Amino acid sequence: MSELGVLDPARPAARAAALRCDGITKAFQGVHAVNGATFEIPDGQITALIGPNGAGKTTVVNILSGAMNCDSGREFIGETEVTNWPSHRIARLGLFRTFQLSRELGGLTVLENLLTAPLHQAGESLVNVLLRPGLIAREEREHAERALELLDIYGLYHLRDARARELSGGQKKLLEIARAVMAAPKILLLDEPMAGVNPALIERIGGYILDLKQSGVTVLMIEHNLNVVEQICDYVIVLAEGRTLATGRLSELRENAEVVRAYLGEVIDVDAAH
């Protein structure tokens, strides 16, 4: 137990760690967004990263994906230290991160979006892909059948030639998952994959994420919906004020609900999914 009375943040997960952070920090204009976060992501499991707004969740995901450097601390993928590696090097180790549709990806068709995913996973930057349209054409020759199959599975086949920016919010979430599957990662980082979608689509996306786990993918997802965490996540990391407040299963965190609620206020109710 930690001095906070919750589960020890440094406690090793039951399985081998696919990802590990040791004391990472990141400050912006002297204010710490992440302040000594330490945790492990169990291999082959779905882990939820939860906490109130401003807890440092997105900053942690940015650091893990190589989109941002940490100021101090260490990061590992398996046994390989990847502290402050650029994103293209981290991608080559099998890590893929979904993100909100950028202006550049929004200008591509739905099919082209899927075709960029293997290029990203191979370490190509988006800028390089856009400057070399022949790369997407090559991917279409080699992988169009697989991409169209995925679009059919995710209900986006009829939108294959539409610009991604024209999709609805829910369709964009499905496209993010389809891109991730197309990339065939070992580790997947999801930033609020079910935010702003209706309950029926939440259930569908949850099923797709469980399918990824069944295929051997390790998933780390930022999630605010504790019902979703209860239904599909194996492990939970709670961040508060840039620190790891607690780790474990949601059932374990409920045993410390009073302490957790004292730090998280009404933003996250650990009993909400009970």
Enumerate the predicted regions with their spans.
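ABC-family P-loop ATPase nucleotide-binding domain
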Residues: 1-25, 268-274
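The feature captures the beta-strand-to-loop junction immediately N-terminal to the Walker
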Residues: 50-52
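Helix-to-loop junction immediately C-terminal to a conserved catalytic motif
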Residues: 65
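Conserved ABC ATPase "signature" region
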Residues: 126-159, 207-210
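Catalytic Walker B motif of ABC-type/P-loop ATPase nucleotide-binding domains
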Residues: 188-192
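A short, surface-exposed alpha-helical micro-motif characterized by mixed small hydrophobic
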Residues: 229-231
